[in-house]
Amino acid sequence: MKGILMDYSIAITLGFLVFAIVMFALEKIPLSITAMIVAVGLHLSGVLTAAEAFKGFVDSNVILFIAMFIIGAAFFETGVAVDVGNVVNKFAKNETILIIAIMMLTGIMSGFLSNTGTAAVMIPVVIGICKKGGFNQTKFLMPIVFAAAMGGNISMIGSPGNMIANSNLQEAGLGSFSFFAYGEVGLPMLIVGTLFYAFIGKRFLPEVPTREPDPNYQKNADFSHVPVWKKWVAGLVLVLTIAAMIFEKQIGVSLAVSAWVGALVIVATGVITENEAVKSIDMKTILLFVGSLALGTAMVKSGAGAYIANLIVDALGDTPNPLALLAVSYTHLTLPTKRIV
């Protein structure tokens, strides 16, 4: 009887896995809704209890997400992000140097802030620089997006995928990654990607004749009304929060708690209002995380993960080629659509 139930659970879990992969690729419905359909379905089918299906809502990584959304909102809403972006003006000497400056700054910012928010801030900054310096703006917009995506792999908080992987490691009792563990690969990847675009990739970027940009992107928002002290508080809170996360083990304070100390300072001092803080929380990212975590839990509990692992071992042999395993992993990881968030 136990074996029959196990086979049933594996079949149901694999069915939802295939469903998630297909729906993530087709995007016929929002990714976050797909993830929650999976979580609810795994509970209704009996694979997971309600507590297991929705425990992601109280996961420490979700708590961390929420706090970082608030800190990031202060960084963007006070205009600090635009001030940082304007630093690129100093490097607007030629096309190659400008691409390097834009991509490195965008990548580093997206390593700690919302990738979408970073790109949204950098686009009008770069359009303004191109207009002033006589550069073709179409050469620089795509590198911004790629840099934001690559920069998300610099730190633990750079991308939801990083947090999902870390949560699954903790769930399996395998420990957790350090704050900059991803950066050991992510930072070199950002540097190499930047150099590629600066010296080779730029030749393949479209050269569309420059035309008058949309008024919404022609200039930055006006932050002159924002008190200077708010900018200082927003910047210092972000820097100190990141520092606390880096030295998590030394100070004995978890990432989530450090982030919430910063978020509370932001709201308590009035840098942004309570309503602005609440609006900054991206529920789509939260729901995507919760649903993905539920699927990961089901893969372990049902034995579906072990089943897939055994199939791969049987196909590749007891001592599979590491390159073959890497190819299988990359194929699996590139099936779902990865969003910049």
Enumerate the language-model features and the residues they cover.
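Juxtamembrane and boundary regions of transmembrane helices in multi-pass small-molecule transporters
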Residues: 6, 12, 97, 132-146, ...
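Hydrophobic transmembrane alpha-helices of multi-pass small-molecule transporters
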Residues: 1-66, 70, 184-310
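Short hydrophobic transmembrane-like helices used for membrane targeting/insertion
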Residues: 4, 340-341
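Hydrophobic alpha-helical membrane segments of integral membrane proteins
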Residues: 33-38, 115-122, 142, 154-158, ...
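Membrane-embedded alpha-helical segments and adjacent helix-loop junctions characteristic
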Residues: 33, 40, 44-138, 280-285, ...
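Transmembrane alpha-helix interface/packing and boundary motifs in multi-pass membrane proteins
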Residues: 20-28, 105-114, 146-156, 244-250, ...
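Helix-loop interface residues and adjacent transmembrane-helix termini in multi-pass membrane transporters
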Residues: 25-28, 93, 134, 176
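Inter-helical loop and helix-membrane interface segments of multi-pass membrane transporters/permeases
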Residues: 166-177, 248-251, 310-317
